[in-house]
Amino acid sequence: MVRSVWKGPFVEGSLLKKADAARASGRHDVIKIWSRRSTILPQFVGLTFGVYNGQKHVPVAINEEMVGHKFGEFSPTRTFHGHSGDKKSKKG
């Protein structure tokens, strides 16, 4: 379900403060965030965020194509190791 237009995009307040501070300082450090539910705004383009996936912070470099998506979309939480193979087909 899509969010109402009249509400606007959701962004954590602390995330805006961290992004503004990073822009003002001019440093290109990874900004650690835990808010996977926040929407990526145009003012975040060019910054690198460390999005927490439950184990570690995954570095995500923001570009123009990511605007409007959520941070959590770019930091997978589950690891797929593949299905086990059939023993008959491996025998050859």
Curated annotation (Swiss-Prot):
Q: Which GO terms describe its cellular component?
A: cytoplasm; small ribosomal subunit
Q: Which domain of life is it from?
A: Bacteria
UniProt KW Ribosomal protein keyword = yes
List this protein's GO terms for biological process: ribosomal small subunit assembly; translation
Q: Name one GO molecular function term.
A: structural constituent of ribosome
Keyword Ribosomal protein on this protein? Answer: yes
Q: Which residues form the signal peptide?
A: none
**Keyword annotations for this protein?**
Ribonucleoprotein, Ribosomal protein, RNA-binding, rRNA-binding
Please name the InterPro entries in this protein's record. Answer: Ribosomal_uS19, Ribosomal_uS19_bac-type, Ribosomal_uS19_CS, Ribosomal_uS19_SF
Q: Say which family it is in.
A: Belongs to the universal ribosomal protein uS19 family.
Q: What does this protein do?
A: Protein S19 forms a complex with S13 that binds strongly to the 16S ribosomal RNA.
Q: Which NCBIfam families match?
A: rpsS_bact
What this protein is called in its record is Small ribosomal subunit protein uS19
* Organism listed in the record: Rhodopseudomonas palustris (strain HaA2)
